[in-house]
Design a protein with these regions (language model features):
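Conserved alpha/beta enzyme-core scaffold
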Residues: 1-186
Length: 186
């Protein structure tokens, strides 16, 4: 079965209101041709999960984003992506700003088909103040430690940029990669 799709075919498989994970990290290894195709489409009210960069900025500039779940939105040398900043300051998008590790745990929970994963990440930070929907669990063991119950970040689809792929859907990322695209893809 040939899994090669055109940009138009990908866009036709997406629908407004979806939760879309976008791989890469900041400005690196983003599926920008697909992002541009979404910008030119009728899609709207998207929830994005991303370690954001120009992907988030373009989608915010084109009013495609309803909610953003993120660990950061940066262009590396430029610490804050400008279109995202404007959208956020003008309350044009809902945000769930998390610690980078919390995004990772949310993607891991979804990859393992679990409702949440317990973690210490975020304890003692304002992340919990700004996200009152996050819950806590108590360890059932003798320490009875109170932990964050990071909910699964379930995606409808993930958009990734890889170095190599084939018609069977196999992909390869060349070189050391500290990113979490394999979690987006599960």
């Amino acid at each position: 079965m040939d899994k090669v799709l055109t940009h138009d075919a990908v866009i036709n498989d997406l629908s407004s209101g979806m939760t879309i994970g976008i791989g890469g990290w900041g400005a690196r290894r983003k599926p920008m041709s697909l992002i541009r195709a979404i910008c030119q489409s009728d899609l709207k009210d998207l929830t994005l999960v991303s370690y954001g960069g120009p992907d988030v900025g373009l989608l915010c500039a084109h009013k495609k984003v309803k909610k953003l779940i993120f660990g950061f939105v940066s262009l590396d040398m430029i610490p804050l992506e400008a279109h995202f900043r404007i959208s956020r300051q003008n309350n044009e998008i809902d945000v769930m700003e998390l610690d980078e590790g919390m995004v990772q745990w949310g993607l891991r929970a979804a990859a393992m088909d679990l409702p949440f994963l317990p973690t210490r990440v975020g304890l003692g930070t304002d992340v919990l103040t700004h996200n009152p929907e996050l819950k806590f669990v108590t360890s059932p063991y003798s320490d009875e430690e109170n932990l964050v119950a990071m909910p699964a970040l379930n995606l409808d689809v993930a958009l990734l940029h890889v170095n190599k792929s084939d018609e069977k859907g196999n992909t390869q990322i060349v070189g050391p990669d500290p990113f979490f695209d394999e979690l987006f893809a599960r």
